[in-house]
From Swiss-Prot:
Located on the platform of the 30S subunit, it bridges several disparate RNA helices of the 16S rRNA. Forms part of the Shine-Dalgarno cleft in the 70S ribosome. NCBIfam families: PRK05309.1 (NF003698), uS11_bact (TIGR03632). This is Small ribosomal subunit protein uS11. GO terms for cellular component: ribonucleoprotein complex; ribosome. Keywords: Ribonucleoprotein, Ribosomal protein, RNA-binding, rRNA-binding. The keyword Membrane does not apply. It comes from Geobacter metallireducens (strain ATCC 53774 / DSM 7210 / GS-15). The gene is rpsK. HAMAP family: Ribosomal_uS11. Part of the 30S ribosomal subunit. Interacts with proteins S7 and S18. Binds to IF-3.
Length: 131
């Protein structure tokens, strides 16, 4: 006879009091991912355009990035966060709108830094599209 399925006990997320943190905005051509961490790098909140219900080419729009940033900011503010340092990575269209959404949500932005990786002539890029 098969043993009964064990119940998985999920730990309840405790509310940490983190006054300042780091917001990482990764804006690719297909999606925008926002992650807010504490200064040590431990993730406090995250959200993405695809996770907020946008599919296909709508994930890469500035509006989708704005919705994802608002959601992530709300989660982080539940932990008592008030000010962030912003690191922006990638060439996507959601860069500016995600940043504006974080500011509109009530965060005090200490500084904004572009950390897009630029190759020193590394890998060959994909060939140009012919439509």
């Amino acid at each position: 006879m098969a043993s009964p399925a064990k119940k998985v006990v999920k730990k309840k997320k405790e509310k940490k009091n983190i006054p300042n943190g780091v917001a990482h905005i990764q804006a690719t051509f297909n999606n925008t991912i926002i992650t807010i961490t504490d200064p040590a790098g431990n993730v406090v909140a995250w959200s993405s355009a695809g996770g907020k219900g946008f599919k296909g080419s709508r994930k890469s729009t500035p509006f989708a990035a704005q919705v994802a940033a608002e959601d992530c900011a709300k989660k982080a503010q539940d932990h008592g966060m008030r000010s962030v340092e912003v690191y922006v990575k990638g060439p996507g269209s959601g860069r500016e709108s995600a940043l504006r959404a974080l500011q509109a949500a009530g965060f005090h932005v200490n500084f904004i830094r572009d950390v897009t990786p630029i190759p020193h002539n590394g890998c060959r890029p994909p060939k140009r599209r012919r439509v």
